[in-house]
């Protein structure tokens, strides 16, 4: 559709069905929301072969149970999604990206929190720690930057609104000891920055060729973000592992890319222990073990801790809709 865009900024290998099934998110979720808010309706094939249409084109509805939300994030346990009806957004009149670097991770996070508390409608605000920036500089040739804690920020709106947003956030960054903004006004310059951000996974692997990556997906309330990331950095140091931090911190979501030698059983155990530590810390602080990647096989035990007795209700729903257990067995829920 002319003049519209899909705001849930997909990763390189994403599919719409997969994004709906895992309730995925992305760099623009802080302003535009996740797949939960973006999916308006679905066509689903149920385990008994019925083809069911959920949702309407209306922006809101108080009619019946919200089956769309039931299926979004269900990871194929309750049916197969064959069609997705999406909400699109108008292309912003003006777009500016900026990069700001800091002397400490705490200063960068304080800038994020102050920005959100003031209600500045940033379109994206991404945090990369010094280790992650070092990998990105080497892999994506970002030679104009230093290996320091960094925020990648993007602003959308009218020209005057964007100018006001930029001035507010830059002042907050300077108050926290940040560098002046480096701007990317042209589409090709913005694309270069966001391509580097999306290439973090490959940048991390390039630091240790032949090794494997184990990801984490913790998401916590903004009020717990500083505590969670600070404790996580300490855990990384204690582990001795190479594990850069990058995150969509505008909604409290951050990732570790734990790079380890998969041929070394000790290294794998240490990587698994660190990933488990991050997930359990997020849960303890009122967050979740997975903000956008989903549960799959590896987080089954973690969501049982996170949801407690509610897990049994989830199992009841699974049994009611799929009594023979034919839909994606063994994933998400231990039946």
Please state what every model-predicted region is.
Residues 131-132, 249-253, 294-301, 335:
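Small/polar glycine-rich anion-binding or flexible loop at a beta-alpha turn
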Residues 1-6, 40-61, 223-227, 262-273, ...:
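A short, flexible low-complexity segment enriched in Lys/Arg and Gly/Pro that occurs
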Residues 76, 256, 322:
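Conserved, mostly hydrophobic/aromatic
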């Amino acid at each position: 559709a002319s003049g519209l865009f899909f705001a849930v900024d997909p990763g390189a290998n994403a599919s719409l069905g997969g994004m709906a099934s895992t309730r995925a998110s992305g760099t623009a979720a802080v302003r535009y929301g996740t797949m939960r808010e973006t999916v308006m309706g679905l066509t689903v094939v149920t385990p008994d072969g019925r083809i069911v249409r959920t949702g309407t084109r209306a922006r809101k509805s108080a009619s019946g149970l919200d089956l769309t939300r039931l299926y979004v994030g269900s990871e194929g346990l309750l049916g197969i999604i064959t069609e997705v009806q999406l909400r699109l957004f108008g292309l912003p009149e003006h777009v500016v990206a900026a990069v700001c670097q800091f002397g400490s991770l705490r200063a960068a996070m304080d800038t994020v929190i102050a920005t959100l508390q003031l209600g500045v409608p940033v379109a994206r605000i991404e945090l990369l720690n010094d280790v992650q920036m070092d990998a990105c500089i080497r892999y994506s040739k970002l030679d104009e930057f230093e290996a320091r804690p960094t925020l990648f920020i993007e602003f959308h709106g009218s020209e005057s609104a964007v100018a006001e947003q930029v001035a507010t956030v830059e002042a907050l960054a300077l108050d926290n000891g940040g560098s002046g903004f480096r701007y990317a006004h042209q589409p090709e310059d913005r694309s270069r920055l966001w391509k580097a951000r999306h290439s973090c996974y490959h940048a991390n692997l390039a630091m240790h060729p032949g090794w494997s990556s184990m990801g984490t997906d913790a998401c916590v309330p903004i009020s717990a973000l500083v505590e969670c990331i600070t404790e996580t950095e300490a855990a990384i140091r204690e582990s001795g592992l190479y594990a850069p931090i990058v995150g969509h911190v505008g909604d409290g979501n951050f990732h570790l890319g734990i790079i380890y030698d998969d041929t070394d059983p000790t290294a794998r155990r240490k990587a698994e222990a660190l990933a488990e530590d991050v997930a359990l810390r997020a849960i303890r602080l009122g967050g979740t073990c997975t903000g956008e990647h989903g549960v799959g096989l590896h987080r089954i035990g973690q969501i049982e801790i996170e949801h407690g007795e509610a897990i049994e209700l989830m199992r009841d729903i699974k049994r009611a809709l799929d009594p023979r257990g034919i839909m994606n067995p063994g994933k998400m829920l231990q039946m």
